[in-house]
């Protein structure tokens, strides 16, 4: 028996799942050699992906955006995924003018991504003050045009475990000042963030990653240091993880999937100053199925990965289906000789077998 894409409650059997094709509303596709690896792994499982703009140089204008999009599409086509659609974003930075955002929207960019300066990889150019008058005009333009504001919600100067919670006052300010602006709090990791998103109007939503459904801080530093579990925002407490897990399976349309899959070369992870980011795209479908099954919530998986995000962004739902079966497989210990994936060497219980 196969689950239906028309009635989520029909996805009840535990050996085969068929759902509408999936979206990833937070993906790092990188550049050059890493891009040639990241794109096929994302396109293999996701019909669309919201592409993060924190490359070098950052996607801050149409020339860079067009070139980057063409590079992604070229790799996707050559890898056998001609239908893959990269949803492009523009990086919001100090000093940006509203005209740039207007052009970005006209070009087809669906979101502007705001990183607090220094918050994560390649965020040296970002936002130092969300309340600056010049950025107010940018946010007003986004609000008027229906463009989504995607935010990395951390305050970089706060202690690591408090950065997300400290940012929530900025999230609340943005939601109050720009009541029609759609805002996504990316990759939430704390109970306080879940509660804040729930308390704010329907214009505010959040993405949840697969790795934050599995990790706590102990998985990063509790025994031996595991650099392949290091990401930003860093994994938090058991209580925080429980809140994020409950949000993912709640059926609340404010919460949807964004992988934040972020590949780095092995030598840049296993070193004295390792990069933040976890490469999850090869295992995300398997782990999501495993997690939702463990919580007796497979009937809500499709909405989390295929419906809620698309509806929030005002996009049509994907056509076609993706099928997973319950069949053990071992995650490779390394991809392309230099990228270590999440759950490397472990045996997972679900695997993708068909896309149509």
What are the roles of these predicted feature ranges?
Residues 24-25, 38-63, 81-93, 109-122, ...:
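Divalent metal-dependent hydrolysis catalytic cores, especially in the metallo-beta-lactamase
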Residues 208-275, 322-356:
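Active-site neighborhoods of metal-dependent hydrolases
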Residues 74-83, 176-180, 201-202, 296-297:
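Short helix-capping segments at alpha-helix termini
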Residues 21-32, 149-155, 208, 259-261:
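Histidine-centered catalytic micro-motifs
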Residues 250-317:
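His/Asp/Glu-enriched, well-ordered alpha-helical/loop segment
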Residues 86, 161-180, 198-208, 262-282, ...:
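Short, electropositive alpha-helical surface patch
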Residues 96-114, 122-257:
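Histidine/acidic residue-rich metal-binding segments in metalloenzymes
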């Amino acid at each position: 028996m196969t689950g239906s894409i028309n009635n989520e409650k029909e996805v009840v059997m535990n050996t085969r799942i068929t759902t509408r094709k999936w979206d990833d509303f937070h993906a790092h596709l990188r550049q050059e050699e890493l891009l040639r690896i990241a794109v096929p792994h994302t396109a293999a499982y996701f019909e669309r992906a919201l592409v993060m703009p924190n490359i070098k140089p950052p996607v801050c204008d149409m020339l860079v955006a067009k070139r980057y999009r063409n590079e992604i599409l070229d790799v996707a086509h050559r890898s056998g995924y001609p239908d893959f659609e990269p949803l492009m974003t523009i990086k919001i930075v100090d000093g940006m003018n509203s005209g740039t955002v207007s052009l970005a929207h006209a070009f087809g960019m669906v979101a502007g991504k705001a990183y607090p300066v220094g918050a994560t990889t390649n965020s040296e150019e970002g936002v130092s003050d969300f309340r600056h008058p010049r950025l107010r005009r940018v946010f007003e333009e986004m609000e008027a045009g229906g463009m989504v504001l995607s935010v990395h919600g951390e305050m970089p100067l706060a202690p690591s475990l408090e950065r997300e919670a400290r940012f929530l006052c900025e999230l609340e300010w943005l939601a109050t000042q720009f009541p029609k602006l759609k805002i996504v709090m990316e990759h939430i990791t704390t109970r306080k963030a879940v509660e804040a998103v729930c308390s704010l109007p329907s214009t505010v939503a959040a993405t949840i990653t697969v790795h934050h459904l599995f990790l706590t801080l102990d998985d990063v530093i509790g025994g031996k240091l595991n650099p392949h579990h290091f990401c930003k925002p860093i994994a938090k407490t058991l209580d925080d993880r429980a809140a994020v897990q409950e949000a993912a399976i709640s059926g609340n349309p404010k919460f949807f999937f964004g992988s934040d899959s972020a590949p780095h070369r092995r030598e840049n992870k296993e070193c004295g100053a390792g990069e933040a980011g976890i490469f999850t795209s090869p295992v995300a479908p398997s782990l999501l199925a495993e997690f939702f099954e463990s919580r007796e919530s497979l009937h809500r998986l499709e909405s989390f990965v295929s419906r809620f995000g698309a509806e929030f962004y005002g996009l049509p739902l994907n056509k076609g289906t993706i099928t997973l079966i319950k069949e053990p497989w071992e995650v490779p210990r390394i991809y392309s000789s230099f990228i270590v994936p999440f759950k490397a060497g472990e045996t997972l219980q679900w695997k993708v077998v068909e896309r149509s």
